[in-house]
Structure formats: structure tokens, C-alpha cells
Regions:
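Short, hydrophobic/amphipathic alpha-helical patches that form generic packing surfaces
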Residues: 22-34, 63-68, 114, 170-171
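Short amphipathic alpha-helical segments and their helix-coil junctions
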Residues: 1-16, 43-50, 90-95, 160
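A basic, often C-terminal nucleic-acid-binding module that engages the phosphate backbone, implemented
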Residues: 28-30, 141-171
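Alpha-helical ds-nucleic-acid-binding substructure associated with the helix-hairpin-helix region
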Residues: 33-102
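Short acidic alpha-helix initiation/capping motifs at coil-to-helix transition points
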Residues: 17-21, 87-90, 152-155
Length: 171
């Protein structure tokens, strides 16, 4: 069942900037929310835009970012997906694109890679607990100011991708 839905979402997300924006918004709305509420929240945002009740806190900033950058993000993602890069290189490139989105941390950026390209996956708090992993390993420096800080973030992203691959969260 998962593979059927994942591939359908990937095809949908790859069709247009608006579709990819909708999938990204769905991903952000799912943060700290029961999955069953997401459909209603998506409807709320489609109807009420910035005044939607579902857009609280950082989610409003994410919506603004997506509306302003969806075409650029879509072009970048599709360029990576359609490239001749290895899956590992595609995963890293996609993670870097999605980590630029306001409100997406490592887990949700990985989820977006999964929902758009079948790569990486979502090691959220539930999976971290289930697999007995250390959550600190998945937290990036917000604004690394040094080469050492940047290198540490790249290392954490690579480690995250590898863990997702090892635990089989990709298609």
C-alpha cells in the first residue's frame, strides 16, 4: 500500500510547481498534528490562504516562502530528479533544496525527498524513538558561521540519508 501511495504522490508532485507546493505544505501542516486532520487543514489553507487557522506560528512563514519560491524550488528539484547524478548525490542535493524551506528540518526535508523522488525518508520523533536513535544527531546548526559548522551540517545530512537508507525508508 505504501509504495502505491508514495509513487502516486511523487508523480503528482512532479507535475507542476503548484502540486509540489501543495505536497510541501501538506508536509509542513503534518508537523505536530494527527495525520487525520491534514486534509481539513489543506482545505482551510486553500480557502482562507494566509488567514487559515491551520497556518499558526512558523507555518504561516512557510506558506509565504512557498508561495514566493515555488517555481524556483520546483525547477531546482526537477533538475536534480532528471539529472544523471547518482541517487546518493540526488538525495544530498534534494535535502539541501528542501532544508532551505522555512519550517522544514531534517525529518520533513527527508520526507519531501521521499514524496518527490522516492529518496531519503522521514526519521521523525516516532521513528527516532522506535529505532533508539539520538535525536541530537539530526539537528542542524541554524546559521553556521564557520567552515567547521558548515562541514558539521553536511556530515549530519549525509548521516541522516545513510540512516534512512539503512532502515529502508525509501521507495
Amino acid at each position: 500500500m505504501y509504495i502505491q501511495h508514495a509513487v502516486a504522490v511523487q508523480k503528482y508532485a512532479q507535475q507542476s510547481a503548484d502540486n509540489m507546493c501543495a505536497v510541501t505544505l501538506m508536509t509542513v501542516l503534518s508537523i505536530r498534528q494527527p495525520w487525520l486532520n491534514i486534509g481539513e487543514q489543506m482545505k482551510d489553507v486553500r480557502t482562507n490562504k494566509l488567514q487559515a487557522k491551520a497556518l499558526w506560528g512558523f507555518k504561516k512563514d512557510t506558506y509565504i516562502y512557498l508561495e514566493s519560491n515555488k517555481h524556483k524550488m520546483y525547477a531546482q528539484v526537477m533538475a536534480v530528479i532528471n539529472s544523471n547524478k547518482t541517487d546518493a548525490s540526488k538525495a544530498m542535493s534534494l535535502m539541501k533544496i528542501f532544508l532551505r524551506v522555512d519550517g522544514l528540518g531534517m525529518a520533513k526535508a527527508g520526507f519531501m525527498c521521499q514524496l518527490t523522488a522516492g529518496l531519503v525518508g522521514c526519521m521523525d520523533s516516532h521513528n527516532i524513538k522506535m529505532y533508539n536513535l539520538d535525536a541530537k544527531d539530526f539537528v542542524l546548526a541554524k546559521n553556521p558561521k564557520t567552515i567547521k559548522g558548515l562541514d558539521a551540517n553536511v556530515k549530519k545530512i549525509r548521516n541522516y540519508i545513510q540512516i534512512c537508507h539503512e532502515y529502508g525508508t525509501e521507495n
